[in-house]
């Protein structure tokens, strides 16, 4: 949640197979959407993060507010009667708890009860005090590898004596 301190801040996430756009609206609520324009399917936001008052598709310029509502179209007369209420961004259930943002990436799924779902971990999540943390750096590695092996290398010290004997 540290990435969305102010209204209009947003970030995109593409690692679930669903292009996700997460933003904070003017009412200080976290909102998540499928990051696809309802006109021709282009990505609405192409940057990994930023801040904007509105979200505009770079392809034909359809514009959405921070709640995902369609607010503007270029040359609207060429479209006839378009019901703007039915052409907003597809919203995804999003929750802000314990300094983290939780998003359900499938729009048709039943909304989970986040309090019940996180209850078994609530004490541990609270103790981490993530709300007070600041992101130092973010980067992505796009490698053809088994992520379990890479992660385990940072979690165990058994390999230190042989792999890092001179460091």
What are these regions (language model features)?
Residues 1-30, 63-167:
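Rieske [2Fe-2S] iron-sulfur-binding subdomain
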Residues 9-58:
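Glycine-rich active-site/cofactor-binding loop and its immediate structural neighborhood
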